[in-house]
């Protein structure tokens, strides 16, 4: 870039800066901020993906695609049917790797924020975390009908936080789904089907 050229820089926290190149010094450019504006590229609702740990390296692809599609945060969850069992050391390394993938995917997709990849948690911890959200969806392969789910999705409003639980390849245990339904029986819009 030449002196006097304009560029837009994102800070990863939802802000864009329109800048002009003023000069170059050694190995850096000196920029002047002309305008600061909110990045409008994010979804109107914050989507939290509670993802059951899949086999092999499938989580890398899941993180990449979820971030590209607009997920606000990915929370890896150790469910009963998860084949992958991670000790603390392996889990830490995996989360670091997944976070790097999230950063790359966010840049590639032109996201205004860098979505976080949470620490690997238990299913019970994930349910506790989801209690703070406005809407929780748990797609379940043995559920009957989709009308209630469609209605809940249609009623999601801008600014609401939405948790989506996705099981591992084997899906959720029936008792895991029942446990979630017991926690989320309230007047707020929740779906346990």
What are these regions (language model features)?
Residues 184-193:
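Single conserved hydrophobic/aromatic residue that forms the stacking wall/gate
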Residues 138-159, 163-166:
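Active-site/ligand-binding-proximal alpha/beta "capping" segment
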Residues 9, 165-168:
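Thr-Gly-centered strand-to-loop micro-motif
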Residues 34, 40-137:
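RNA substrate-binding interface of SAM-dependent RNA methyltransferases
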Residues 172-177:
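Short, glycine/polar-rich helix-capping loops at beta-to-alpha or helix-loop-helix junctions
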Residues 1-38:
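N-terminal positively charged helical leader segments and presequences
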């Amino acid at each position: 870039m030449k002196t006097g050229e304009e560029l837009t820089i994102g800070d990863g926290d939802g802000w864009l800066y329109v800048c002009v190149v003023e000069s170059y010094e050694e190995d850096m450019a000196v920029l002047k901020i002309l305008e600061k504006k909110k990045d409008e590229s994010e979804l109107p609702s914050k989507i939290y993906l509670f993802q059951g740990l899949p086999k092999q390296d499938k989580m890398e692809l899941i993180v990449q695609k979820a971030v590209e599609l607009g997920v606000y945060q990915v929370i890896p969850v150790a469910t009963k049917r998860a084949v992958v069992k991670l000790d603390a050391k392996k889990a830490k390394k995996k989360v670091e790797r997944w976070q790097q993938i999230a950063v790359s995917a966010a840049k590639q997709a032109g996201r205004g924020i860098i979505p976080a990849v949470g620490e690997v948690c238990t299913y019970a911890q994930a349910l506790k975390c989801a209690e703070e959200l406005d809407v929780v969806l748990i797609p379940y392969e043995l559920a009957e009908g989709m009308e209630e789910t469609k209605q809940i999705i249609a009623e999601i409003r801008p600014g609401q936080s939405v948790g989506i639980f996705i099981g591992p390849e084997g899906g959720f245990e029936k008792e895991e789904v029942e446990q979630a339904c017991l926690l989320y029986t309230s007047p707020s819009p929740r779906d346990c089907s």
